[in-house]
Amino acid sequence: MADEDQYRGDDQIDEEEEETDESGYKTVKDAVLFAIEVSDSMLTPRPSSDSKKPAEESPTTAALKCAYYLMQQRIISNPRDMIGVLLYGTQASKFYDEDENSRGDLSYPHCYLFTDLDVPSAQEVKNLRALAQDGDESKDVLKASGERVSMANVLFCANQIFTSKAPNFLSRRLFIVTDNDDPHGDNKSLRSASTVRAKDLYDLGVTIELFPISRPGHEFDTARFYDDIIYKASPSDPDAPAYLQTDSKASPATGDGISLLNTLLSNINSRSVPRRAQFSNIPLELGPNLKISVSGYLLFKRQAPARNSFIWLGGEQPQIVKGVTTQIADDTARTIEKWEIKKAYKFGGDQVAFTPEEMKSLRNFGDPVIRIIGFKPLSALPFWANIKHPSFIYPSEEDFVGSTRVFSALHQTLLRDKKAALVWFIARKNASPVLGAMVAGEEKLDESGVQKFPPGMWIIPLPFADDVRQNPETTLHVAPEPLIDQMRYIVQQLQLPKASYDPFKYPNPSLQWHYRILQALALDEDLPEKPEDKTLPRYRQIDKRTGDYVLSWADELEKQYAKISAHGPKSTLVKRSAKDRTSEVEDAAQKPYKKVKVETDEQGVEDVVRAHYQKGSLSKLTVPVLKDFLNAHGRSAAGKKADLVERVEEYLEQK
């Protein structure tokens, strides 16, 4: 993606240096290569396991559709990811510049590279869609070969594709979709060669994931061949971690590969943002002359539609606009050079100018560091103190050998004693320091044993006093105990499964709609009619679970209201006649009445406010006077009295 800084002026960039700069983050780019077997059994249509879609479909076609949907999603959500489709077992052969019409022997016979491993273009997505929908091209490509295909050849072909197209990617995965659990039978040489090629892929950093498809009357048995070529653990990467969770669950021997692929797509559809390396190898000071090295990652970040570039639509074709900022003098309209611009602050009514070097020194609070100041019990950390996204830190052995051992000891101690460390935290050069709470986090696994959150430390930035606002004064009304007891049954019925909220199951509906529109425009598809919103309550399910309890609660509410009304104070109002009201009006007209003095003179308001400002007693002024002063000077008069006083002080300090 284009860098957003190129569309902003230099002065704007300087003013925002204190904000989190994400341009230096290491994004985890993903490269996925589908290896789909084309055989007679894979091309045979089978009844769908989904009762809503009873149409028969071959496993090869279903796998191609899954690859198409994945490519369709990634082209918008993760535009830097690479996806490729390799068909093996085909009658035709194609690999880069080679095909069956080429001279000489083929490097990889019966391997057809339909989509090269690259960032998918709109045309490649359309071609894959045509193949998955039984187009004219599928009749020529999807023809099974009568010869046996060597899995060693397929794995070596995948090795060359990853090496040439994605040599530096942090996440590389090979998805094998097949229904043949023993491709080589008793041929020990081919089995041994396949094991060697799989080990080469593992050493390269490629994760092989199998999506087995059971045949009718025959369950897929991974122990016959694939247990020897698939490693359970992902290859470790010292530079950056892999994804928090794998996109597909572990494939059981009796699992259906297509259903697993559909699970993969449903997980990816949440468009989770890759983890970002926030900083690398900064010292964690535990005490005087005791330092270890840690790296930090941004695991959670709010994702929103971002403008990558401005588009000019005034010509025949839309063009990307390159932003240029020019400073012009207000009085002479002369172009001002960068060296003529100086930054200044007002002190006591005078402007004090600073050189660029002095400005940098003002912002320099020291080198990046995480310094432990002390320890506090976890109970002293309130829930509302988490106001910004936390940083996840993990030990690094690059600068200080033994960092992992010390980090682990500190992590276990904080967990055991239920304490948090108070730290002085500077993430990068020229970054503003923050006081943070370093909290130890345990490893969390899902029901299938896949890691959801790794073990490590979390640094939570704590708010300063200016960041904490006072809650508005409210009167607490407590419901009667019988009413609370009835509501308890309703809440118990509405709890989520296992009483836990999984954010990956509820994607942002507005963001999904934004991506869907972009996807339709890029692929020349029909615009969708309405967005899919998984956050909407399931009203029928709610009514089924809690309908009777809600009616019982409503009956109890009527009973409690009747009790309160019966014991409430009786009204002492007496209806008066029209004659009484007329006499009161006449008496009021004869009596003199006091008028409230209202200050309407703007100069008078100005003098009063300035006098109180000199005495430091602006808070003693009434809200109408403060609002009149702000309105007279074109300032906003909305908000509470404290906000009005603050705006008045800001205005008078500038004068």
Curated annotation (Swiss-Prot):
What does the UniProt entry say about where the protein is found? Nucleus; Chromosome, Telomere
Compositionally biased region (Basic and acidic residues): 1-11
Where in this chain does the record put each Ku domain?
284-493
Q: What are the Acidic residues biased-composition ranges?
A: 12-22
One annotated GO molecular function: DNA helicase activity
Instruction: Give a GO biological-process term.
Output: DNA recombination
Q: Which residues form the SAP domain?
A: 618-652
Any one GO CC term of this protein is: chromosome, telomeric region
Please state the Enzyme Commission number of this protein.
3.6.4.12
* Reactions that this protein is recorded to catalyse: ATP + H2O = ADP + phosphate + H(+)
InterPro entries tied to this protein? Ku70 (IPR006165), Ku70/Ku80_beta-barrel_dom (IPR006164), Ku70_bridge/pillars_dom_sf (IPR027388), KU70_core_dom (IPR047087), Ku_C (IPR005160), Ku_N (IPR005161), SAP_dom (IPR003034), SAP_dom_sf (IPR036361)
The entry's keywords: ATP-binding, Chromosome, DNA damage, DNA recombination, DNA repair, DNA-binding, Helicase, Hydrolase, Nucleotide-binding, Nucleus, Telomere
The main location is nucleus
**Which superkingdom?**
Eukaryota
For region Disordered, the annotated ranges are 1-27, 39-58, 568-590
Q: How does it assemble?
A: Heterodimer of Ku70 and Ku80.
Q: What does this protein do?
A: Single-stranded DNA-dependent ATP-dependent helicase. Involved in non-homologous end joining (NHEJ) DNA double strand break repair. DNA-binding is sequence-independent but has a high affinity to nicks in double-stranded DNA and to the ends of duplex DNA. Binds to naturally occurring chromosomal ends, and therefore provides chromosomal end protection. Required also for telomere recombination to repair telomeric ends in the absence of telomerase. ku70, of the ku70/ku80 heterodimer, binds to the stem loop of tlc1, the RNA component of telomerase. Involved in telomere maintenance.
| PANTHER family for the chain | KU AUTOANTIGEN DNA HELICASE (PTHR12604), X-RAY REPAIR CROSS-COMPLEMENTING PROTEIN 6 (PTHR12604:SF2)
Which family would the database say this protein is a member of? Belongs to the ku70 family.
Name of the protein in question: ATP-dependent DNA helicase II subunit 1
Taxonomic lineage of the native organism: Eukaryota, Fungi, Dikarya, Ascomycota, Pezizomycotina
